[in-house]
């Protein structure tokens, strides 16, 4: 199974969705919903830098995919009144790739590097003096004739985004003056996002319909917008085009997205632990064989949300289903779950 095959995958699904995301993206901080802490901090730092006519300090945005890191980078550039250049860590293979971007920046411009944890060590070394002293040290020539040339750069702001902050090297992380973690959104925040997107897409939606979509969106705006588009199609064909709670519920049931935002693969994994392995503990290899998936798919794609929501636990002895998992599927809870015996292994 490929993650992007799932309707509730937090990653972008193709260029068409990227284009639609761009159209739905808020342009300024006042339009940005949620992330109150990060938004409040950025508003102060942006206003201060703008008042001094300086470049904003370098910004690191980290958190799960689909929460608005790229959107915030665009907003930072817009609020600062400067241009933004966008790239990603895997694309910057050589020092020259980064040098070409840096030397074409105007004063106070924003350089956005997505997946910054995937920068090569060679490129990262070039980035250090650029971030710290606004200078670029590059080697010209090879062998004994090689020489270092220093280029002065205009002041700029590097905005780095990553889903894996732990993979950043300490020297790189320490060079960011502003570090913001993006959290999963509440259902109310997502309902506001769904309402805003529905307005831009010219979709008639009721408050309860927006909430129904929000509750199943796994705390992620990207998923909420994707589900909205699918529910819109259902409402257009099966009803009068208005997205009510009943229409949203019927559409999402048809799409196999349940009340918790679980899809077929989530339920398959949980039921395997519950029914085939008596709730666990079960080793990862056995679980992978039982549901016909790769170990990496379970660890990187399926498990994180189930663990974060409290339906699955990782222990030294293996995976264990929690009381919530039994309750979700209407199964009797074994006595051992409530005794704490499993947690003490």
Swiss-Prot record:
Compartment(s) of residence: Cytoplasm
Binding site for ATP: 24-25, 66, 69-71, 132-134, 175, 185, 222
Residue ranges that the Swiss-Prot or TrEMBL entry lists as coiled coil: none
Name under which the protein is recorded: Holliday junction branch migration complex subunit RuvB
GO biological processes: DNA recombination; DNA repair
Region (Small ATPAse domain (RuvB-S)): 186-256
Protein family according to the UniProt entry: Belongs to the RuvB family.
Record keywords: ATP-binding, Cytoplasm, DNA damage, DNA recombination, DNA repair, DNA-binding, Hydrolase, Nucleotide-binding
Keyword Glycoprotein: no
Binding site residues for Mg(2+): 70
Enzyme Commission code(s) on record: 3.6.4.-
A GO CC term attached to the entry: Holliday junction resolvase complex
Head domain (RuvB-H): region residues: 259-345
């Amino acid at each position: 199974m490929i993650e992007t095959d799932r309707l509730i995958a937090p990653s972008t699904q193709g260029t068409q969705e990227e284009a639609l995301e761009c159209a739905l993206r808020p342009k300024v901080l006042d339009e940005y919903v949620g992330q109150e802490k990060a938004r409040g901090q950025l508003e102060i730092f942006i206003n201060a830098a703008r008042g001094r006519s300086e470049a904003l300090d370098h910004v690191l945005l980290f958190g799960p995919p689909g929460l608005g890191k790229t959107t915030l980078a665009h907003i930072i550039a817009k609020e600062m009144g400067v241009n933004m250049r966008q790239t990603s860590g895997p694309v910057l293979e050589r020092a020259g790739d980064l040098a070409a971007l840096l030397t074409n920046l105007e004063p106070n411009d924003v350089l956005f590097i997505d997946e910054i944890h995937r920068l090569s060590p060679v490129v990262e070394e070039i980035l250090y003096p650029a971030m710290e002293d606004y200078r670029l040290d590059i080697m010209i020539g090879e062998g004994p004739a090689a020489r270092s040339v220093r280029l002065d750069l205009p002041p700029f702001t590097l905005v780095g985004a990553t889903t894996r902050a732990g993979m950043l090297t300490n020297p790189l992380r320490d060079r960011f003056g502003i570090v913001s973690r993006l959290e999963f959104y509440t259902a109310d925040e997502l309902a506001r996002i769904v309402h805003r997107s529905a307005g831009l897409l010219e979709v008639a939606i009721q408050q309860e319909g927006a909430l129904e979509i929000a509750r199943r969106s796994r705390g992620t705006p990207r998923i909420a917008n994707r589900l909205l588009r699918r529910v819109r199609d259902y409402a257009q064909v099966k009803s009068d085009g208005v997205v009510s709670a009943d229409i949203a519920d019927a559409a999402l049931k048809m799409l196999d997205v349940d009340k918790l935002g679980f899809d077929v693969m989530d339920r398959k994994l949980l039921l395997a632990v519950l029914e085939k392995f008596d709730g666990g503990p079960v080793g990862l290899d056995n679980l992978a064989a039982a549901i016909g998936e790769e170990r990496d798919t379970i660890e990187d794609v399926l498990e994180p949300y189930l663990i974060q929501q409290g339906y699955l636990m990782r222990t030294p002895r293996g995976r264990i289903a929690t009381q919530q998992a039994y309750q979700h599927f209407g199964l009797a809870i074994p006595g051992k779950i409530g005794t704490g015996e499993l947690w003490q292994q």
